[in-house]
Structure formats: C-alpha cells, structure tokens
Curated annotation (Swiss-Prot):
Taxonomic source organism: Chlorobium limicola (strain DSM 245 / NBRC 103803 / 6330)
Lineage: Bacteria, Pseudomonadati, Chlorobiota, Chlorobiia, Chlorobiales
Main location per the UniProt record: cytoplasm
UniProt-recorded Gene Ontology molecular function terms: DNA binding
Protein name (Swiss-Prot/TrEMBL): Probable transcriptional regulatory protein Clim_0475
Similarity annotation: Belongs to the TACO1 family.
Amino acid sequence: MSGHSKWATIKRKKAATDQKRGNLFTKLVKEITISAKMGGGDPSGNPRLRLAVDTARANSMPMDNIQRAIKKGTGELDGATYDEITYEGYGPAGIALIIETATDNRNRTVADIRHIMSRNNGSLGESGSVSWMFQRKGSLDVPKSAMQEDALMELLLDAGLEDLDGDDEVYYTVVTDIRDLENAKKALDEAGIAYENAKVDLIPENYIELEADDAEKVIRLIDALENNDDVQVVYTNMEISEKAMDSLNG
C-alpha cells in the first residue's frame, strides 16, 4: 500500500457502502444510446457500445432496457437526442475537475453545473483549463486474489499493458492505451481471469493530496454533480491519505 487513495479507489469504497443506486441506469442508457448512434448497433463492431453494454449487464440492467437503448441510438425507436459536452473547472483546495455530460438541453445543463459548482466552493473554467493535466487511457480492475502481480504483468505485457497500479487493497488497476483495452480484456478472458470496471478513463498525470476536511468538501461537490441526470462521469486529480480516508469513513 502507498498510504494514499486515488479517486478510483475512493469511488469504489463509496459505492460499496452507498445505499443509493441513484440515476445509474439513466446514465447507462444515455451511454448506450450515444454509442449506438455514433458507431452502429452491433457491439461486436463497436468497442464503445460493447463496453457500455458490458457495464450495463454488470450492473444488472435488464436486456430489454439495453436493446431499447440501442434501438433509440440507431433510430429504430424514437428517443431524445443527446449532445456530449465536457466541462472543466476547479473544486475546493484547487483540485481539477473534468465533468462529462450527455444532455438534450445545453442551457439547462450548464446552468445546473454552474449552480452546483458555486454552491460547493467550485468554479467552472475555460475549455482546456485542466484537461492538459489528464491522459485518456483504457483501464480495468483485476482482483488481487485472482493472481500474483508478476504473473499478471507477464500476461498483459504483450497485450498493451502500460501501467499496473497495486495501491488498492483489493484490486490491481490495469492501464493501457485506449486502442489496447480490448487486447487486455481478450488476454484476461483467454486466461480465465475475472476483471471489472473496464472503461475508457481520464487519468491524472499528477495527484493533489488532500486531508479530511478538504476531501470531504470535494466529495460533497462530486456527489452533487453525479446526482445530476445530465452528468455522466466526473474525473479529478484528488488523492487522500489513508489516515484522512479512515477519518472520513469513521
């Protein structure tokens, strides 16, 4: 253990104890619809859609819902048209935030996000103000109980592995180039190794460590953003010491 928790680890711990499923299905339906619209309705030929469908199934979304979302994307069924808009800004203690949205009303969305940010000691920035701090990568989580770190690294070296993060107590986080994510999944599938949370991710080049008080403010802001139906995902460069994390959990 490094003695610190990055945002991905923090989110995983929160999800394990958070009783609210919230608007998860709404977000998943939007992602499936957009993916099908952009790349067609066949997951085998549309990697983004395949990831979205896999995520939906992992979260127990009924296949009927998935199929309807795909058909709305391909135009076989009527449905709302969503625009993907990314906002950038800063939260408490100067941490960077990237907020990805899918909306059928741009004016409503930007007004809502600006309101949430201002009420929680955050501020929106210009396009490009913080995105330079992040790199878009493929990532997935492999339970540490599945295999040893050296063996996992050897398995994935020829499948595009760029980094293997073992800071979390339970999971290794596998990081790849976006184009190699499917190769990593295939290698794990062929080896019979389970994995979770395969996704395209925004990974900070550097992290800002926060103590409990500031971390609590940032988490409150991110919770408020993610509870908005138009917000798909929030990325941040926050890192919390294990001592501060224990204080928050206590």
